[in-house]
Amino acid sequence: MNENFVHKWKSQVKKGTLAFIALNVLKDHEFYGYELIEQIKKHTQIEIAEGTLYPLMNRLKKENLVTSKWVEQDSGIPRKYYTLTATGEETLLQMRTFWFDLENSIKKISK
């Protein structure tokens, strides 16, 4: 087995699906950055760094897929919460359709 090839392939798949994963996590609940990282890890076992998440969230904001707001905490340290927009929900539906079609196609050829 070519472990190096598989490792690189897994990395590419993770990078290519991270926006899809983040939008799915935000579908029914708003989260601040650290919570979002933890939710992604909990549901996918993918560990991402803050240095990966925040540029992604900025791109999603520029595309009007998510919004953010600062919320003051009792500790005095504000947290930036991310929420899916209506455009984000529509986009996520399109992405899910593509993903499920792709998944079904892969299952067919993998038998």
What are these model-predicted stretches?
Residues N64:
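Glycine-centered, phosphate/nucleic-acid-interacting loop/turn motifs that mediate DNA/RNA or nucleotide
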Residues K10-T52:
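N-terminal helix-turn-helix DNA-binding core of bacterial DNA-binding proteins
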Residues E90-K111:
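Amphipathic alpha-helical dimerization/coiled-coil segments
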